[in-house]
Amino acid sequence: MAPTPLFLLLLLTGVTAEPAHPGYAEGDGSSCDVAAVAVAERREEFDGGRIVDISHYYREEMPEWESADGTGGGFLRLVRSMRNGSDIANFSELRLTAHSGTHVDAPGHVFDHYYHAGFDVDTLDLAILNGPALLVDVPRDSNITANVMESLHIPKGVRRVLFRTLNTDRKLMWKKEFDTSYVGFMKDGAQWLIDNTDIRLVGVDYLSVGAFDECIPAHLVFLEKREVILVEALHLEHVTPGIYTLHCLPLRLRGSEGSPARCILIK
């Protein structure tokens, strides 16, 4: 006997569908449900806290290197708009430096011969950018020197380390004006890491891995042999120290020495 229409209706109403986009309230299922009111929910954690987004979202007040004005209001523009009737879809235009917000550095950033030889972000090793990572707290009263590195007792075999510093406590990535007093690696700290550890990915919580006074010397040490990948301006505020699985994916920008990146940790 074929089920009655009423029975089919009861079966269908008893099924609870998972939202396709968990960050927004669901409409009636229509792709053009303009009458529904959607409320955007922005989160740092997903899947019950198992996945943590450690990238900073791009905004006008985000700091930029040696700028008092931050990213500015012109970095993201809606150039074609449905609302004013000029188009059937919205189209935005993005204008940023390659080292804005959470980003990676390629060897060509500080070595001109590497830049012209093609060592751009498209050549970075995804096997280094993805895998187990250790998050450590750095002593809050110092830049990252050789003595500080030695005091952290990072075990041999650890290949990816995220360094949380006073920058996170001071919320420097939430302040529009660039701050030269940020914490970073001194040249001797970078050299100690290269000489005494197996680290191949270095992550930090402000715009540069190198302290302001030794910014370029620290970069040169890290990138000279093209074995270390630098990830800068990470959002580490709500993450506890420990071991995670890191996934960090820059854009495939052929010819660029840097790229914005989306980085997540999985517990």
From Swiss-Prot:
Q: Name one GO biological process term.
A: response to cold
Q: Classify the source by domain of life.
A: Eukaryota
Tissues in which the protein is found: Highly expressed in leaf sheaths and leaf collars.
SUPFAM superfamilies per record:
Putative cyclase
Q: What does this protein do?
A: May be involved in the control of plant responses to environmental stresses.
Q: Where in the cell is it found?
A: Secreted, Extracellular space, Extracellular matrix
Its recorded name reads Cyclase-like protein 4
Alphabetically, the GO molecular function entries are:
arylformamidase activity
Query: Which conditions up-regulate this protein?
Result: Induced by cold, salt and drought stresses. Induced by abscisic acid, auxine, brassinosteroid, ethylene, gibberellin, jasmonate, kinetin, reactive oxygen species and salicylate.
Q: Which family does it belong to?
A: Belongs to the Cyclase 1 superfamily.
Q: Taking the first listed entry, what is the main subcellular location of this protein, grouped into a coarse class? A: secreted
Segment forming the signal sequence: 1-17
Q: Is this entry keyworded Membrane?
A: no
Q: What else is known?
A: Plants over-expressing CYL4 exhibit reduced tolerance to cold, salt and drought stresses.
A Gene Ontology CC term for this entry?
extracellular region
* Source organism of the structure: Oryza sativa subsp. japonica (Rice)
InterPro entries xref list: KFase/CYL, KFase_sf
Keywords for the protein's UniProt record, in alphabetical order = Extracellular matrix, Secreted, Signal, Stress response
